[in-house]
Structure formats: structure tokens, C-alpha cells
Amino acid sequence: MKKLFIVLTFILLSRYIFAQIVAGPMLGYVEHREAAIWVEVDAKVGKIGIEYWPKTNLQNKIIIQFKGELKNRYNPITFELPELQMNTAYQYQFVIDGKAISPSKIYEFKTKDLWEWRKPAPDFKFLFGSCVYINDSIYDRPGKPYGQNPIILEKMADTEADFNIWGGDNLYLREADYSSASGIAYRYSHDRAALELQRVLAARPNYAIWDDHDYGPNDSNHSYGLKNVTYNCFKNYFPQRNYGYNSTEGIYQSFKYSDASFFMMDDRFYRSANELPDMLDGKPNADKTYYGNQQLNWLKNALISSNAVFKFIVNGSQILNPVADKECLRSYDTEFKELMKFIQTNKINGVVFITGDRHFTEMHKISTPGFYDMYDFTSSPITSGVYAVDKTKENINPTRVEGSLFIGNSYSRIGISGPKKERKITFEIFDQQGQLKWEYSINQAQLTVPK
């Protein structure tokens, strides 16, 4: 009887402690010697720490206590784990109010390897997608729920990959959300707590940008009055090494993985209204901005100085689609031409755009004489409603890669593989059930300026 009592007490205590975790854990960035781990705890929690150790050395445990304020309505927390060993698997667990969570709640990550000047660039794969709508009937529009079957998030967790990139509209602020700071905080916390999200967020590192719906109202621009609130919320829920540049606000950033660089763009914070005229007095409207001068200059400097074989520009809306609606960089003629001219004039190899937003998936290829073909791969939506683009004028699109159009809930996996100077990118589209629907490869030579 005493043994049974002890077992029951342990089970109840473990359940109580784990119930104090509202959402998470989520892996943020993971570098060679540092990693970020995110979690959100209940308002009742008075103290939380993280205990971590090399997987092969259980005796070498380190505990970091959270020093910030707790017991707020919402308590998103980021632990930064410093001075890690390279190319090493670590395990971790949380300690809440002095008690460790059940051993079944031990999580794992692995730091990056130092491969440069030592070995070939590692092959890798990452998941990419956009538009995650979590139903919340109190605040949703009447009628059929807009959010689709969240089982796709479980399928993403089961799909082999090294990290995730969330391509914007990672949640949807409703009218009752984006009208107040408390509404915004509620939406970020509510959607992050979705049960189906937890495994995919804990499985591997996560990187993210936003688009209009996690920034503010539909098609929102730099005039949105609470953009600093959503900016801070985004940073609190997606921990990265840095955001913006030189004290400039915005969620743009970059990171490198193996021999690829990722330039994560902010297409909202400095964006002019779509409705502003594209032309003034017969000339492009130079005041109609998309990225803004500082962000665009940051991108130029980052691109021209990058030694990566592949340079992925990640954006919330499409870049190259010539028949897209107003939500495309191509509709912002001045900045679009400036960026394309810069890439071509400076003969920057390996540039590929990966984008979200459209509620269908496709790839565009644009040919320019004397330069390599440029690609824009769009992956959308994960759980949001699907857009029947095949019933619109966009159904016939001369730049769409044949077979790439997929209309349905989906996510994508992008892989980089191959020997030195013969690297290739492989794009894969998976449906709601995790079934492969389309595959396409581009080799390094195809993304190299002709000599």
C-alpha cells in the first residue's frame, strides 16, 4: 500500500508540474556553442529553471534559473544555454518550483559541427510552410471553421528534417485581437498552446518571419498603430540571436546552416500601403516602399559578402510572380528592380526565394538574358483555408514551373545535398497526411552566372 501511495503521489505531482507548462518547449536557434530554448508557464509558477547535460555524460548537469518576472497573465520565457560543446547531443528538462518534471519529459537537441576547412559541407533538410490558423470559436467568423485539420502539424513532426522555417502568418490575429495589446498577447499565447504544435516545435530548431496576420490586420502596412506590440510579442515567442540591424526595429535577421545562408525578411514593418499608386507622373513611385532603405541596404550587404553556395531569401509574400495580386514585391516596382539589378550587376550566385501567404503552393522560374534562372518557391497553407487559384485568372501563369501547383493544405521540405561544386537543392511538397506530392531539384550550376 505504501509503495502504491508513493507511485500515485509521483504521478499526480508530475502531472501537476507539467500542467504548469502552458506551451513548449520550443527550440529556438541552435549554434555551435549556444542554444535558445523557449517555454511558456502558467501564472501560478513562482520559479523555473532548466537543467541540461551532454547526453553521454549525465553527471555533468548544469542548471540555469530564470531571473525575470513571473506570475503575469502570460509568461513566455527564453533560456539561453552558453558555452556548449560543438557537435554534441544534449538533453534537458525543466525544474518548476524546485521540482523536476517527469523523466518522460526530457528533451534533446544537438549543436552544430565545425565543418569548415575540415570536411565537406554537411547535407541537410529543413521544413518550410506558412499560414497556420488555429480555430478559436469565440473570436472566429460565423460558419464553417477556417482552420483545417491540424493533423498536418503532427505529420510535420514526423517528417525528417534538421530545422523548421515558419514563413509568416504563423498565427492569425482576429479583429478582437489586433485592436488591443491584451488581445495580441492572448492570440500569441492561445495559438502557441495548440496541442498539435508541441511536438514539431520541440523536435528541432525553429526560425520564423511574419506576414500580415501575425503582424496586424489583413494586408497591413507600416501605419498599423500597434506594430511595436506585435513586434515585441513576436520576439518573445520566436527567440533568435538578433532582430533588425544597427538598432533598427523589425524582425529581419539572418543565419547560416552548412553552406547555405538564410536572409529572413520583414515585409510589413516598413511597408507602404498596397493602395498607393505604383506610378507618379509617369515614373515609378519611389516613396512606395516594401522593405525600406535600411533593410534593403542590409540585405544587399549581407548578400554580397556571403560565401554561401545557396542564399535563401525568405519572405512572407511572393517575390517574382508577374501576375500576382498586390501582395507581391513585384508590385513595388522601385525596390523590386533595385534588388534584381543589384543581384545581377554584382553576379551573386545561388539566390533562391522561398515565400508564403498565397494559400496554395507553387514555384516560379524567371529567365533573364545573361543571368541564371531565378526561382520563387511558395509553400502555403499549413492549416488555413485553401485558395482555389485554379478558378482565377492566375490559373494560367507562364512563369509557373510545370506540375508545381498544389491546391490543398501542405508543407514543404527543402534539402541541400551533393559533393563540393555539385550541390543541389531538392524541393518536396507534402499534403495534409504527410504524403509526397511533388519533387523538383535545382543544381548548383543552374544557379551560377554564365561565363
What would you call each of these model-derived segments?
Residues 20-451:
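Metal-dependent phosphoester/phosphodiester hydrolase catalytic core
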Residues 1-22:
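Bacterial Sec-dependent N-terminal signal peptides
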